[in-house]
Amino acid sequence: MKRTFQPSVLKRKRNHGFRARMATKNGRAVIARRRAKGRARLSA
């Protein structure tokens, strides 16, 4: 049985990257929450 996590930098960036987050209203909300919390890394 193959493992479920098959890493790919491209897919990671496209789905969870900063630009992907900023593309939608909810994504921007995610960034705002993480900024408010003081996260060192805001996105993948």
Swiss-Prot record:
GO terms of molecular function? structural constituent of ribosome
A Gene Ontology annotation in the biological process aspect, one of them, is:
translation
Database matches in InterPro entries: Ribosomal_bL34, Ribosomal_bL34_CS
Lineage, top-rank taxon, reads: Bacteria
Q: Cite a GO CC annotation.
A: ribonucleoprotein complex
Q: Does the keyword Glycosyltransferase apply?
A: no
Could you list this entry's UniProt keywords, alphabetically sorted. Answer: Ribonucleoprotein, Ribosomal protein
Disulfide feature: none
The record's section on Pfam families has:
Ribosomal_L34 (PF00468)
Q: Which family does it belong to?
A: Belongs to the bacterial ribosomal protein bL34 family.
Protein name according to UniProt:
Large ribosomal subunit protein bL34
The source organism is Colwellia psychrerythraea (strain 34H / ATCC BAA-681)
Q: What is the lineage of its organism?
A: Bacteria, Pseudomonadati, Pseudomonadota, Gammaproteobacteria, Alteromonadales
